[in-house]
Amino acid sequence: MPIDYIAASLQPLSFDGQAPYSWDQFLSLMPAGFVVPDAVTGVGSARWSEIETQLRNSIAIARGSEKHCRIASSCDLYWQNRVSAAFQEKDPLKRETLIDRVWWDAAGELTPLSSPLSYGALETYALRLKIVLKRNGVSKKDGDAIFDKLTSAAEQ
């Protein structure tokens, strides 16, 4: 099936919405040979590898771990400033949301304006779907349970 048809047939994603597909459902829709971009390993197009390295370096610097920076062929101050601004947030949940938003926006860089139904659009969708699935897995109830477990262990 042509890539433009696949890209056009995908359900829309919303940053704060529910994921329209499970990860396995999404993979079953992809063309043979599709390399799933991965924010952890940097697998994907050369463009994604470069953006991913810049974001990881910016996060490492914001956490004070410059020694963990990777070699990047360029340095985009836009991403550094976005990550730095996210780390200014005191509330950990809001900070994580801002960082997720940076990753979301960075994934959008893979879709060329001149070709919105291209292979890059599939990469963007894959990365954004991972973000939505991660965000869907976070709940206040689970967070409170973990907090209670940690604080009860500390009180003993």
Regions found by a protein language model. Give the residues of each.
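Extended alpha-helical surfaces
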Residues: M1-Q156
